[in-house]
């Protein structure tokens, strides 16, 4: 599968740097997730333009069905399903609920549905990857990198990622 690069940032960062945004695709950026913008708004609605950059939208377990449809219509890259209620890195992941919600979400869009927030181990990643188009592991990975002090710590991170990749690419 082709690797892609996405930026996650606040809308003002993109608005203040429209010239840079217009050249994102020149430097290999494929899409953006604007964390503080309502998901129902497309990039064009926000006053940001670059025809080659896709938008990623968040849908959570508490998003209403009506709003989910609007968010799916406004997104152009993929839908990022937030797998838990709470903050990223939390630990209360209900795999059966996640899988059911991802399947319901896929009925509202032709876009890929990625699932993340609170995903930390290969068992969770493997289970979710059976229904989702992809799995996002962010906080756990960033935390591991920040805590790494020596080469062997980085090797553990590499091995962790290799294990995750092996179970989701089955």
Residues of each region from the PLM?
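Active-site beta->alpha loop and helix N-cap motifs at the rims of alpha/beta catalytic domains
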Residues: 1-37, 167-168
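Alpha-helix-loop-beta-strand connector modules within alpha/beta enzyme cores
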Residues: 1-5, 46-61, 96-113, 156-170
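Hydrophobic faces of well-ordered beta-strands that scaffold small-molecule active sites
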Residues: 5-9, 32-34, 55-59, 79-81, ...
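Active-site-adjacent beta->alpha loops and helix N-cap segments on the catalytic face
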Residues: 15-17, 34-51, 64-69, 88-103, ...
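Catalytic cores of alpha/beta
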Residues: 19-20, 63-74, 119-135
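Non-catalytic positions within long, well-ordered alpha-helices that form the structural scaffold/packing
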Residues: 24-28, 72, 106, 129
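Histidine/lysine/aspartate-rich catalytic loop segments that bind and position anionic ligands
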Residues: 52-89
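Alpha/beta catalytic cores of nucleotide-metabolism and tRNA/nucleoside-modifying enzymes
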Residues: 101-111, 120-170
């Amino acid at each position: 599968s082709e690797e892609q690069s996405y930026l996650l940032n606040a809308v003002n960062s993109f608005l203040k740097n429209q010239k840079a945004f217009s050249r994102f695709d020149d430097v290999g950026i494929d899409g953006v997730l604007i964390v503080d913008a309502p998901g129902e708004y497309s990039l064009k609605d926000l006053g940001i333009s670059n025809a080659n950059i896709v938008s990623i939208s968040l849908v959570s377990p508490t998003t209403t069905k009506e709003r989910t449809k609007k968010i799916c219509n406004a997104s152009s890259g993929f839908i990022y399903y937030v797998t838990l209620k709470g903050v990223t890195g939390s630990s209360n992941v209900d795999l059966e609920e996640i899988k059911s919600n991802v399947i319901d979400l896929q009925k509202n869009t032709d876009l890929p549905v990625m699932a993340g927030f609170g995903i930390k181990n290969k068992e969770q990643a493997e289970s979710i990857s059976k229904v989702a188009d992809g799995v996002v592991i962010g906080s756990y990975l960033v935390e591991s990198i920040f805590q790494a002090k020596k080469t062997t710590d980085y090797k553990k991170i590499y091995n962790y990622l290799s294990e995750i990749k092996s179970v989701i690419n089955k």
